[in-house]
Amino acid sequence: MDPSEKKISVWICQEEKLVSGLSRRTTCSDVVRVLLEDGCRRRCRQRRGQRRGLTEDPSGQLELPEPPDENDEDDDDAMPPGMLCGPPQCYCIVEKWRGFERILPNKTRILRLWTAWGDEQENVRFVLVRSEASLPNAGPRSAEARVVLSRERPCLARGAPARPSLALTQEKQRRVVRKAFRKLAKLNRRRQQQPSSPCSSTSSSTASSCSSSARTHESASVERMETLVHLVLSQDHTIRQQVQRLRELDREIDRYEAKVHLDRMRRHGVNYVQDTYLVGAGIDLDGQTPEGEPEDATLEEKGTEPAAPLDSEAQAAALEELARRCDDLVRLQEERAQQEELLERLSAEIQEELNQRWMQRRNEELAAREESLEPDGGPDGELLLEQERVRTQLSTSLYIGLRLSTDLEAVKADLDYSQQQRDIKERELQGLLQSLHTFEQTVVHDGALGSSGPSREPQPQTCAEMWVDQARGLAKSCPGNDEDSDTGLSSMHSQDSDSVPPVCESLV
């Protein structure tokens, strides 16, 4: 169904028809008329084939071919060729898309509609059905079984509309459709091959009226059966589209779940599920108090136990706020990168424009100088030559100055960025030093508490003190302190070392 080839496909029952030669003025009524004419030609060809297949017995009577067996459930070619019978006004084209359908008006430009679908053309089907087998309104609707009311027995419409097709399996539905096709073919065959006996002179008007009424009743039955068959096939198309749509939605859900899982793995780690379930267990384990602790610590922990849920809620709120700020930060970084890229592109364009202007001006000056030197070659020409040379040097110096100014601006920007990074590193270093100072005080406090305990405990405290002394010595002997003396880091190191008493003195 390529729109460049001016052709579309229309489904008739379970057969796909390709309608070619469309133009921008082709309407749905034109397509219906062409399909009905094709059906009439097929019926005529089959009728001629049936006439050629008639055999004459010795008694001189014509013998019709044997009708198909009604109990043959596996006959797939039971669709009658005379399925489309009636005027074009009795048929319409239904547009089906992802389980939704609507009736197309007769004046709809079908090629324009098909082109407007764009990428969704593979999910669109045009189905030719009888007008009685579709809804009266032309709006979109979901697939739902519709009961065709009988005009002869209106009492069946009093009860609730039954939907037995939903309870049947796919094989049973296929058998029902085949049986309906065979029955409709049988009715059409009887109507087409009914022997036309010559009217005798003694035939009355009563006999002719009875035959006409029987023929009318038979045609009404055929139309009703055809309507039911079209309805079943239309619902079959709709159900297939709905099943395909459900599979697409399942695939989209799987892709989204995999994306969310990978996102969480990158954000919270591979074992984020276990960590989430073990958060409560970790809080419970931290809330347990050992037996050898003093009673004051136990009472203090008991007093903080009821506030644990509040802490967890506050932690969750803080995590949400942190996630929101991280998203804002990422968005700002993306905008900053875009602005920087735009700035670089504009700078390159400006520089290129300046170069072109300078070269153009230089060429014009050279051309003017050549023209001025041609008339006279005396002292005036030498003065003009010297003037042009000085002017050329001035323009060159101006160009070089512009380039140096541009480079200077770039260097200033890099210097500002480096200054910002240095400030950030300095703040981080101050935070680490503060943490180290706090840790030293904690170690000193633990050593003071451990001095009153058994004599076997000072050995681990001495190891901790040695580690702290080594850390302090590394902090003081850092070679970067001399370079950063203007920032006050060396004075801060000296203040820290002076303010904190040695660990050995505290132990003594």
From Swiss-Prot:
SUPFAM superfamilies: Ubiquitin-like. Residues 66-78 have a biased composition (Acidic residues). Residues 1-133 form the Ras-associating domain. Gene3D superfamilies: Phosphatidylinositol 3-kinase Catalytic Subunit, Chain A, domain 1 (3.10.20.90). Residues 487-498 have a biased composition (Polar residues). Expressed in neural progenitor cells (at protein level). CDD domains: RA_RASSF10. Disulfide bonds: none annotated. GO terms for biological process: nervous system development; positive regulation of neural precursor cell proliferation; positive regulation of neurogenesis; signal transduction. Residues 51-81, 186-221, 473-508 are annotated as: Disordered. GO terms for cellular component: centrosome; cytosol; spindle pole. It is found in: Cytoplasm, Cytosol; Cytoplasm, Cytoskeleton, Microtubule organizing center, Centrosome; Cytoplasm, Cytoskeleton, Spindle pole. Keywords: Coiled coil, Cytoplasm, Cytoskeleton, Neurogenesis. Residues 195-214 have a biased composition (Low complexity). This is Ras association domain-containing protein 10. It comes from Mus musculus.
